[in-house]
Amino acid sequence: MEINDLTHTIIGCAYKVHKVLGFGFIEKCYENALKIEMDKLGIHALQQDKVNVWYEEHLVGFFVPDLWLPEKLIIEVKSVQNIPREHEVMLVNYLTATKIDDGLLINFGPSVQVKRKFREYKPKGSLIDALVR
């Protein structure tokens, strides 16, 4: 599945989860429900899988993404009033560490909030996009 279709489908899953569960559960409930919805559609993500962080040739630590499709997409799930900026920065760092280009930050707050993040800046409607078309 192409990445834009994949992210669109996962966002649809998030809205379904929010419609059923509403707001107020802990993050893990939404993460588990999102994984179930994704699995139903044949989108099989790794959940809470440890990923090593390297500095040059040295292992310096690890992080644990909520859900991820290796080499395709990292999904971070939150259950807060609004998405804090530091969570956006953290997702971009995860993308950089894994060399994955795309990430979704999904907040199951009073309403669903979705932020799509990229490892590298991708301006919308740039001159290059216009020339390629």
PLM regions and their residue ranges:
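Solvent-exposed, charged helical/coil patches
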Residues: 1-44, 112-113, 118-133
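Nucleic-acid nuclease catalytic cores
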Residues: 78-125, 129-130
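Accessory recognition modules or surfaces
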Residues: 2-9, 57-69
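A short acidic/basic microdomain associated with nuclease active sites
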Residues: 39-57
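Conserved catalytic cores of phosphodiester-cleaving nucleases, focusing on short active-site segments
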Residues: 22, 45, 65-81, 94
